[in-house]
């Protein structure tokens, strides 16, 4: 049904996100940079548009001052954590995924064909661009 909707509904359009100013921050819930990387891998391969809320790409956490929830998700960008280390590498990972997505319009706007369930694999194709994605599992 998923592929059928993507492939045949001319009005199909979706905008996906993992965090927003109205939700909890993904990193704030899980505190796991490796999980944030895996989420980025899946997220940046979704069809349609993707909305990256500031800090999704850098593991930005909620404010620690006990403020109101709405303000906690609007905390300052975690610039001081991005000079080096795990969070800097996370940003580089998101940048690489963004460049890949930008270079392959089939990811966001291509026809979708599932190849297998285990490992999960699919092909997306748009005009001359064709991408095959295989989720082989996660690195422990």
For each predicted feature, which ranges?
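Alpha-amylase-like alpha-glycosidases and glucanotransferases acting on alpha-linked glucans and related
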Residues: 1-48, 58, 107, 115-118
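Extracellular/periplasmic catalytic domains that process cell-envelope and extracellular macromolecules
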Residues: 6-10, 44-46, 68-71, 124-128
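Short acidic/histidine-rich active-site segments
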Residues: 53-63
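Short helix/strand-capping turn motifs
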Residues: 49-53, 67-75
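Carbohydrate-binding surface patches
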Residues: 99, 114-140
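Aromatic- and carboxylate-lined catalytic core of secreted/periplasmic carbohydrate-active enzymes
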Residues: 3-4, 73-115
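Short, glycine-/Ser/Thr-/acidic-enriched flexible segments
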Residues: 22-23, 57-59, 84, 127, ...
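Substrate-binding cleft/loops of secretory-pathway carbohydrate-active enzymes
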Residues: 1, 61-71
């Amino acid at each position: 049904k998923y592929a059928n909707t993507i492939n045949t509904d001319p009005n199909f359009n979706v905008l996906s996100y993992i965090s927003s100013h109205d939700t909890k921050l993904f990193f704030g819930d899980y505190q796991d940079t490796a999980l944030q990387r895996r989420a980025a891998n899946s997220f940046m391969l979704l069809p349609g548009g993707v909305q990256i809320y500031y800090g999704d790409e850098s593991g930005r956490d909620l404010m620690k001052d006990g403020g109101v929830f709405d303000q906690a998700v609007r905390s300052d960008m975690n610039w001081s954590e991005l000079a080096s280390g795990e969070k800097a590498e996370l940003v580089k990972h998101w940048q690489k995924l963004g460049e890949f997505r930008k270079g392959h319009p089939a990811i966001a706007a291509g026809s979708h064909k599932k190849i297998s369930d285990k490992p999960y694999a699919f092909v997306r194709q748009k005009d001359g661009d064709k991408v095959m994605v295989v989720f082989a599992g996660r690195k422990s």
